[in-house]
Amino acid sequence: MKLTKTFKAFFENEKSGGLLLLFVTVISLWAANSSYSAGYIAFWEKDLAGHSITHWINDGLMTIFFLLIGLELEREIYHGELSNIKNASLPIMAAFGGMLIPAATFLALNFGTSTQNGAGIPMATDIAFAIGILSLLGDKVPASLKVFLTALAVIDDLGAIIVIAVFYTTSIGFVNLAIALGIWVFLFVLNRMKVYNLIPYLIGGVIMWYFMLNSGIHATITGVILAFVIPFGDGGEKSTSYKLQHFLHQPVAFFILPLFAIANTCIAIESNWHIGLNHPNAFGIILGLVIGKPLGILLFSSIGVSAGLCALPKNLKWAHILGAGMLGGIGFTMSIFITLLAFKDPEIIVFSKIAIIIASIISGITGFVYLRYILTTNKNT
């Protein structure tokens, strides 16, 4: 399977971005637990136009990340792995299992408790981290495994977006929502009229973001729906969608996601931090990501192939799918993002973040070691 030029560029940026995320996370955790802790934590909570700096990153800059995800998803649907139903069905089935089983695992431990709202936390996959770890294995990785993991993670993020929109919206301001959707319809009309200039779409997107923010629906959803009205054309290098997607890759990989990681891993770990891990919430997150993710991905992929709904690529074995499932358990930035929507209690948020970091480390290490073993030995499984 050949990799397209666009996919290669995406993979390279995500690879480097994943390694950068790892670095800044370590630095942020160190700073939050050093002699600079008080000033460091206070900086991210500093008020800026009525909200903390962290809030502006989470509700503002992350909208740009979701815009890129939307553009990637659009390209996959029109020209990539998701354009052919036979090819798309395997990562779709895998992603479905990779969301359902972790959520069910979490709910099995938390249903009926004050933390049951966190079921969406172990459903997510951090694309940058997962691909970053996979890239460390070098040229041994089959091209189809790279494509599978990327498509799986993109679909996973789409699922996370739907979860955010449906389950983490407490109250809706219908007037603001109607205005936001009206702007989207206007931009859609511009698209159909073949208006290719990017400026009106970006201006409309900013205005739509403002009204979406005040509607009660998480403003980052704006990024995804905006992506689907930006002209795609033939998808070539001169298309509006391609130009924007290409432009956003590096700012997202090397600025927005690292900034999000720094701001949201600013965690002062107390001496009794392990006590919070005895809570069903932490157990649910860790088991959901470490066990539920690979189990769900492998199980539903197997069901899809057995039922004739999809096919396993020729150079992939079930061992590869299991390894990809392990890397899918790296929830990190996306899981933290959902945590901030699911909970209001600062203590629960901190313990949830610690659980996510632990689960992501376990998933990353086990996935890397396992895939390295099977790729090195070329074991037939």
From Swiss-Prot:
Q: Which BP terms in the Gene Ontology apply to this protein?
A: regulation of pH
Q: Which reaction does it catalyse?
A: Na(+)(in) + 2 H(+)(out) = Na(+)(out) + 2 H(+)(in)
A single Gene Ontology molecular function, please? sodium:proton antiporter activity
Tell where it localizes. Cell inner membrane
Its membrane topology is listed as: Multi-pass membrane protein
Q: Where are the transmembrane segments?
A: 18-38, 53-73, 89-109, 118-138, 147-167, 170-190, 210-230, 251-271, 283-303, 321-341, 348-368
The record's annotation in InterPro entries points to: Na/H_antiporter_dom_sf, NhaA
GO cellular component terms given for this protein:
plasma membrane
Q: Identify the domain of life.
A: Bacteria
By its UniProt entry, which Pfam families does this protein fall under? Na_H_antiport_1
The record's keywords, sorted A to Z, are: Antiport, Cell inner membrane, Cell membrane, Ion transport, Membrane, Sodium, Sodium transport, Transmembrane, Transmembrane helix, Transport
Keyword Transport assigned to the entry: answer is: yes
- Family recorded in the similarity comment: Belongs to the NhaA Na(+)/H(+) (TC 2.A.33) antiporter family.
Functional summary from the UniProt entry: Na(+)/H(+) antiporter that extrudes sodium in exchange for external protons.
Q: What name does this protein carry?
A: Na(+)/H(+) antiporter NhaA 1
Q: Which organism is it from?
A: Flavobacterium johnsoniae (strain ATCC 17061 / DSM 2064 / JCM 8514 / BCRC 14874 / CCUG 350202 / NBRC 14942 / NCIMB 11054 / UW101)
- The gene name reads nhaA1
